[in-house]
Amino acid sequence: MRKDVAVLMVLWVMCIPYATFICASATPNKLDTLKAFLRKKILYDEYVPIDSVICWSENILPVIKTNNRNDENYFLLQLQLANAYTLRGDISLAIDRARLMYEEAKETEYEFGIAVANQAIGDAYTIANQCDKALDSYQDALKELNHLSQQHPYRIQLLLKISNALQRKGQLEKAQKILHDIEQTLQKQPDYATCFFANIEKANYAISHGHLSKAYLKEAAAYLYNMDSIYRIHPEKFYCFHLKYTTAAYYRAMGNWNRMYWNKALQLYEELRQEYTVNKQSAYYRWITQETIYLYKIQGKSMAACLLYQELYSTVDTLTAEGYVRQINILRAKYQIDQME
């Protein structure tokens, strides 16, 4: 018996260095994957779900913090984590991460970090449907970035956010000017991932005018074709969601001219809703359900719309959303006070 125990102890001691080596080598591989996600502008893929992205980021960021506090990737990885929290429905954690980003960047007066922190604040406002404040935060982020360079390569990412916020506010002429700026930038600095999401914004702009003329919807179809072309070359699961979601919006708009398209839109929304129903707090599930409710409403399907509305907007959710807005307001107020000092 003692001999067996001794053998086990020897084996255990021998395994410790090997286990340490495995842990040490695994972290760089995970970090490389997260950095690859940054380049692709995705939050998950077919093999790495959103929960893994969050878990890896939470473990890796404290390790790389010491030597990377003034590194762009360090803050972009934090933004990626904040967006992953938001997508999963953990809004409070996303706000906490935005606060941490701002405090770290402010401590070292790192302007890129302050810019990205303001973007994270804007993203939190966006998910809380506070479009005015989201736009203000994105513009603050752009102002901070312009202190570094008005030609900074990250500028186009903020322009995409600003365009989206302007469209949500109904300021379509301003959004169109931003989209033109984005298009010019992409001609000089081609990037397939940014091009994919730029086509989403251009498609959304055309779809928002679809009730005026079918010509706008023809434009939207061209942008969807561009998205599909990129997706076929780079078949990311993250892109697939956005392609289907934007296509459903196109079908919904086409339904104003031919109601048969509403059935196509509902089919796509239902397909996406079933895929993401495992977490009904996720941003994707809520977006899809909101669009489905609207589509039921314009089709006169009041009961179906009401049932989904009750599921999505419970009293607890409303009170929680108000709490989120207060959290974000406090964080943005801190930035505004710092600007006055």
Question: What function would you assign to each model-found segment?
Answer:
Residues 31-35, 51, 263, 273, ...:
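Hydrophobic positions within repeat-based interaction scaffolds
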Residues 35-36, 76, 116, 155-157, ...:
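Residue register of alpha-helical TPR repeats
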Residues 58-65, 99-106, 140-146, 180-190, ...:
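Amphipathic alpha-helical segments of tetratricopeptide repeats
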Residues 70-73, 113, 153-154, 194, ...:
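Structural signature of alpha-solenoid helical repeat junctions
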